[in-house]
Each structure stands twice: as C-alpha cells, then as structure tokens.
UniProtKB/Swiss-Prot annotation:
Broad class of where this protein is predominantly found: nucleus
Annotated RCC1 repeat ranges: 40-90, 91-142, 144-195, 197-262, 263-316, 317-367, 368-421
Region of interest (Disordered), residue spans: 1-22
Cystine pairings recorded for this chain: none
Gene symbol of the encoding locus: rcc1
SUPFAM superfamilies linked to this entry: RCC1/BLIP-II
Domain of life: Eukaryota
Coiled coil: none
Keyword DNA-binding: no
Protein's UniProt name: Regulator of chromosome condensation
Length: 424
C-alpha cells in the first residue's frame, strides 16, 4: 500500500440530525478490500428472535430452520450483532432490525413493532461494508469514511460511542483523517483498517481488545477518562529495524482482535483465557502479539472469526481450524475434544471459503455453497431443528436452502443470519 497520502478534511459543525456535513478538500478515492461484499442475494435468519433480530415480524419469536426475510433489494452483506441484524443493500443502503435500546438500529423505532422488521437507515452516503457488535453498528462508505450508531458497554454498563456516556440513535461520523478500507466489530469494540495499513481502535478495552491501552488504564480510561477509549487511535507496533508494522486485514472476536500484517504474520490482542488467541498462556494481551502458533502452518490465513471463548479460522487452501474452549462442541473436534491452544484442523469438512462464529457456535461455508454448523444448540442457531449440542460439523438443511447456495454466515448472541442466492 505505497504512495497513499493522508487526506485532510475540513469538518463543519454537526447538523442537528447527528450526521456531519463534511467538506472535502479533494476528491476521495473509492476504497476497496477483498472483504467487501459484491454478490447480491437474499437473507435467511434462524434462532431466537424475541427482540426482532430475525426480522420476520411481531408474531415470529424463533425459527428452527432458516426463514426468508422480506427486503426490497438484493443484499450484499448481512451482519448479526448481539441482538440486532444489519443488511447492506446492493445500492449501498442499510437496513436494520432487532433491539434498538442503545440505538444500534440507527433509525426511529417509536412506532410499535417497527424494530421487528427491516427498516432503512437514513444515510446519504453509499456504504460498502457494515459491522455489528452487541449494541453498536458501523458503516464504511465508498470514499473511506466511517459512520457509527448505538453505544459501547463495559462491565459496568454504557460507556458511550464517540463521546463519554453518549449513545447515538442515528449515524454519526468517526473523525479520522485517513481513508478506511475495512471495519470489524467485537462485542464492544471497533477496529478500523486504513488505506495506509494502520489499525485504529475504539470502544471497551477491559480485556485488551483495543491493543493500545495498558491494563492499568482499561477501567474507563484511567485518569485520562473515557476519551482514551472512545476516540479512535492508531496502534503503533514497531517493526524489526525501522518503521512500524502495517496490516492488510483485521478480524474481531467477542473480546479479542486478530490482524494480519502485510508480510502475512498473524497478530492478536485481547482476551485469551481459553487460549482463543493461540497464546501459550491464558493471560490477556494488551498489545499486539506475534502469534507463533499460526506460523506452524505454511499456508496463508485468509479468515478468522471469534466467539466468546473460541476461534475458527480458514487458510488459503480451504482448510478450517479451531482453537480455544471446547465445551458444547464449539470447536467441531468431536465429543471428547479438549481445549486447544493452537489452530487444530477440523475433520470431515470439504473445501471451505469462509468461517463464522457466535458466542458458542461455529460455521463453515464450503466452496460449493453449503453451510456446516456445530456447537451449542440451545438457541436453535444450528438449523438442526433440535436444541441438542452438535460436536462435529453437520450440514444445515431447510426448505429455503434446497435451491440456494450460501454466500456467507454471521452469528449473533442468539440468532444467525445467512446470505444466500439461487443456484444457477
């Protein structure tokens, strides 16, 4: 990523609706990243939906099998938050449904039942990527700006979004001077990857997931206050010799972060109490660690997804791996599996394109468009129709999957979202 210049912008006063009027001093580039969705499809949801996160209306509180969500255009990305869902349309518009207590839907839901079905977020800019956490949502525009709505929380409650103790019910712009090319959300933290290969983080840092805040300051920012946490700041990681490490990709677990350097090295920071980062010990990492457990593979890593205490990942050869906590079958390594401190191949899977995880569940999407699921069955997120835990990968079936291929999966606290399209 050479020759990119930092762009300076003049930021005008925020309008009363909460969005910023940004006067650009030069034309901004169209940002690209392999993670941006480009193939349009339909959205299926399953699991528990008592606060509307399934998007199926007021009368449907759960679905044992994937159900079709009614949307007005093709969807190129679907992201599951803790208790809400975010869909990105092919036009660049955002549709949300689910819990709006902290503003994670980014729209007015005062009309009874309006949060239970998809509604459009008012944002003039064309969006190319979305991410969702427990009670926040982020949107990346085609010119590299980031808008957020909702709030971050820590163990004591709401901490705010961009300002201390202030949530936002509508999109507000993140002030960062360099175009962003990818966004990723954990439960209560946000990571921005810039065109220059830098990582900016914001949100809760209690478990080290921001990668830039020492442990003594993670409790609401210490004497510097919440601004230390909520204002996105760059992670400065020195490289061997001179300069610093630059990154090409980033992924979030619930309370931890993975980042891949431009040289292909895997770094991690945050909670690792079950070795979910691939560290030898179970201490939290408050600064990026070069994870040697991922060097044991000669392949390049192309995808990571972290639950509460486990991680699933996939390499460039289409092989899926898991590590971390084993209870309830979330690793997919069989009923007698134990905690894993390094990436462990998941048996009985075909060639895989992508992986996903919820708190205690995991998914893998094969190159031929099938989805496999395993882990805790309590919330009906696995598509088996039963509440039993699944210890090894099982292919998900259902009426709406018979003639459709799965493009991607995203999983929240109690529900799961599939992006699918008709098989040609």
């Amino acid at each position: 990523m050479k020759g990119k210049k930092t762009l300076k912008r003049t930021i005008a006063a925020e309008e009363s609706n909460g969005t910023s009027d940004v006067k650009k001093t030069k034309a901004l580039p169209i940002v690209t990243h392999p993670s941006h969705g480009t193939v349009g499809g339909q959205v299926l949801t399953l699991g528990q939906g008592d606060v509307g996160q399934l998007g199926l209306g007021e009368d449907i509180m759960e679905r044992k099998k994937p159900a079709l969500v009614t949307l007005t255009e093709d969807i190129v990305q679907a992201a599951a938050g803790g208790m809400h869902t975010v869909c990105l349309g092919a036009s660049g518009s955002i549709y949300t449904f689910g819990c709006n207590d902290e503003g994670a839907l980014g729209r007015d839901t005062s009309e009874e039942g309006s949060e239970m079905q998809p509604g459009k977020v008012e944002l003039a800019e064309k969006v190319v990527q979305v991410s969702a956490g427990d009670s926040h949502t982020a949107a990346l525009t085609e010119d590299g700006r980031v808008f957020v709505f909702g709030s971050f929380r820590d163990n004591n409650g709401v901490i705010g979004l961009l300002e201390p103790m202030k949530k936002s019910m509508v999109p507000v712009q993140v002030q960062i001077n360099t175009p962003v090319i990818k966004i990723a959300s954990g439960n209560d933290h946000l990571v921005l990857l810039t065109v220059d290969g830098d990582l900016y983080t914001s949100g809760c840092g209690e478990q080290g997931q921001l990668g830039r805040v020492p442990e003594r300051f993670t409790n609401r920012g210490g004497r510097k206050g919440l601004e230390r946490l909520l204002v996105p700041q760059c992670i400065h990681l020195k490289a061997k010799g001179s300069g610093r490490v630059h990154f090409q990709d980033v992924f979030c677990g619930a309370y931890f972060t993975f980042a891949v350097s431009q040289e292909g090295h895997v770094y991690g920071f945050g909670l690792s109490n079950y070795h979910q980062l691939g560290t030898k010990n179970t201490q939290a990492c408050y600064a990026p660690q070069n994870l040697t457990s991922f060097k044991n593979s000669t392949k390049s890593w192309i995808g990571f997804s972290g639950g509460q205490h486990h991680t699933v990942c996939v390499d460039s050869e289409g092989k899926a791996y898991s590590l971390g906590r084993a209870e309830y079958g979330r690793l997919g390594l069989g009923e007698n599996a134990e905690e894993q401190s390094e990436p462990t191949p998941i048996p009985d899977l075909p060639k895989i394109n992508s992986v996903a995880s919820g708190a205690s569940v995991s998914y893998a999407v094969s190159t031929d468009g099938c989805v496999f699921a395993w882990g805790m069955g309590t919330n009906l997120q696995l598509g088996t129709g039963e509440e039993e835990d699944v210890w090894s990968p099982e292919q998900m079936t259902g009426k709406h999957l018979e003639d459709r291929e799965v493009l991607s999966v995203s999983s929240g606290g109690q529900h799961t979202v599939l992006l699918v399209r008709k098989r040609s």
